[in-house]
Amino acid sequence: MDNQHRKISGYRELIQAEIDLMNKIKALGPQIEAVLVEVANHVTAQWSVAWQAEDERERLQMAGPDYWLGQARGDLQVGLMKLTRAVAQPTTF
């Protein structure tokens, strides 16, 4: 397929090395998502135990692992987007 970016306003044509780099960045997404799912499953298991142990429930409420997991998900998505923009170098907002 011909380089599509020349038809997208604000994007330049990418050379093969840049396309390869973009594909490496994009390949990280599913790997990172898999780790996020593992952490989510771990936290869910902790909450299951915590409902039967008040001290553990209080600890989890104070630690806020669900909050931090959500923050990590968003930050990692933003990080991957920033990497792709660093390679593609669009000139539009």
Language-model segments: which ranges?
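Intrinsically disordered, low-complexity regulatory regions
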Residues: M1-G64, T92-F93
